């Protein structure tokens, strides 16, 4: 399942078709936010229906916005720098996504930490993809 979802992003060449990459990262982020919001509502039952809807929307739309900013920033960075397969593009995109999280929580500290962690994680994922690391290994039968 995760391979299929991520394939729609990885199949698009870096630095091209930014609108499709942004759509893919937005949908991946929105799906992740929906899963997190489902756990949030299930583990801490809201007092009213509207509180549950608000919490679901808050998590889902925040994660979708982070995904959209990541996809757009990393793609535009690849185009502007003319280095499509550089992990620095992903570091920039991850940092921009982290800053969105900091703005959403209205906290400079969370924004700075999320910028560093999301940027480094994204850069490591790109380095792993370039070097052939296997995140989802094929089972040996």
Curated annotation (Swiss-Prot):
It is found in: Mitochondrion inner membrane. The keyword Membrane applies. GO terms for biological process: mitochondrial electron transport, NADH to ubiquinone. The keyword Mitochondrion applies. Its main location: mitochondrion. It comes from the Eukaryota. One of its GO terms (cellular component) is mitochondrial inner membrane. The chain crosses the membrane at residues 22-43, 58-80. Keywords: Acetylation, Electron transport, Membrane, Mitochondrion, Mitochondrion inner membrane, Respiratory chain, Transmembrane, Transmembrane helix, Transport. The modification N-acetylalanine is found at residue 2. It is a multi-pass membrane protein. It holds the Pfam family Tim17. Accessory subunit of the mitochondrial membrane respiratory chain NADH dehydrogenase (Complex I), that is believed not to be involved in catalysis. Complex I functions in the transfer of electrons from NADH to the respiratory chain. The immediate electron acceptor for the enzyme is believed to be ubiquinone. Belongs to the complex I NDUFA11 subunit family. PANTHER family: NADH DEHYDROGENASE [UBIQUINONE] 1 ALPHA SUBCOMPLEX SUBUNIT 11, NADH-UBIQUINONE OXIDOREDUCTASE SUBUNIT. Complex I is composed of 45 different subunits. This is NADH dehydrogenase [ubiquinone] 1 alpha subcomplex subunit 11. It comes from Bos taurus. The lineage of its organism: Eukaryota, Metazoa, Chordata, Craniata, Vertebrata. The gene is NDUFA11.
